[in-house]
Design a protein with these regions (language model features):
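Short linear motifs at protein or domain termini
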Residues: 1-97, 203-213
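Alpha-helix N-cap/helix-start motif at coil-to-helix transitions, marked by capping-box chemistry
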Residues: 6-9, 81-85, 140-143, 161, ...
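Short phosphate-engaging motifs
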Residues: 76, 87, 137-138, 197
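Short alpha-helical functional segments enriched in proximate histidine and acidic residues
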Residues: 94, 128, 200
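Short arginine-rich
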Residues: 195-205
Length: 213
């Protein structure tokens, strides 16, 4: 008697969560055969989940090589977060101007305050802000960045660079500025929040490199 069928979506979800929470370390390979064995599925099913993660930037695959969790250096982090800041500051300014306060962002921030493992809720908060503003093109730009950004958010949590309380408090400031209709303040707080995470993570990565030499 065989067990229940596991759909590619479920495999994708679990792999994604385990990569974000650093259960799979940066640089670690994730092969189709290992995934197929772990989930007791055919290799084509495992491949579907892996290829989806590659398309999102959560995994990288070179030609004829196994997929690997990206190893981002400090320059990668700075580049990603600086571009993210451009998109997210524009998004929160639009929300404030339009008088839109996404309920999903409020719910995600409440979940952060109630959780030690807050990376998934942190990700949900930022995705909800950008998804809630009226420009679909801005949302597409954000989505293109978020795969690698989510890896970074997972690293921030794993290295204890920010506490859930600190993240939630900074998010609440952004929400309050949006609610007040203060586009400039919302944009400023968004930039400060992203820059703080960027600087802590880049410093942590450089420290790890220096200690390994």
């Amino acid at each position: 008697m065989t067990g229940p069928t596991i759909l590619p979506e479920a495999i994708y979800d679990e792999l994604r969560a385990r990569i974000i929470d650093q259960s799979y370390a940066p640089g670690e390979s994730i092969t189709e055969s290992a995934v197929a064995e772990r989930f007791d599925v055919a290799r084509p099913t495992a491949k579907m989940a892996i290829e989806r993660l590659v398309a999102e930037g959560i995994l990288r695959r070179e030609a004829h090589r196994a997929a690997r969790v990206p190893q981002l250096d400090a320059a990668d982090v700075v580049d990603l977060f600086d571009n993210r800041a451009i998109v997210e500051s524009a998004a929160v300014a639009k929300l404030a101007t339009e008088g839109i306060l996404p309920a999903a962002a409020i719910a995600a921030n409440r979940a952060i305050a109630a959780s030690k493992n807050f990376a998934s809720h942190d990700i949900a908060f930022h995705r909800a802000l950008v998804a809630g503003q009226p420009s679909p093109r801005l949302a597409k730009l954000h989505d293109a960045l978020m795969g690698e950004i989510e890896l970074c958010i997972g690293q921030v949590q794993a290295a204890h660079l920010l506490t859930a309380a600190e993240v939630s408090e900074q998010h609440q400031g952004i929400l309050d500025a949006i609610l007040a209709g203060d586009a400039a303040r919302a944009s400023q707080l968004s930039n400060e929040h992203i820059a703080g995470s960027r600087d802590r993570l880049a410093t942590s990565i450089n420290k790890d490199i220096a200690e390994s030499i």
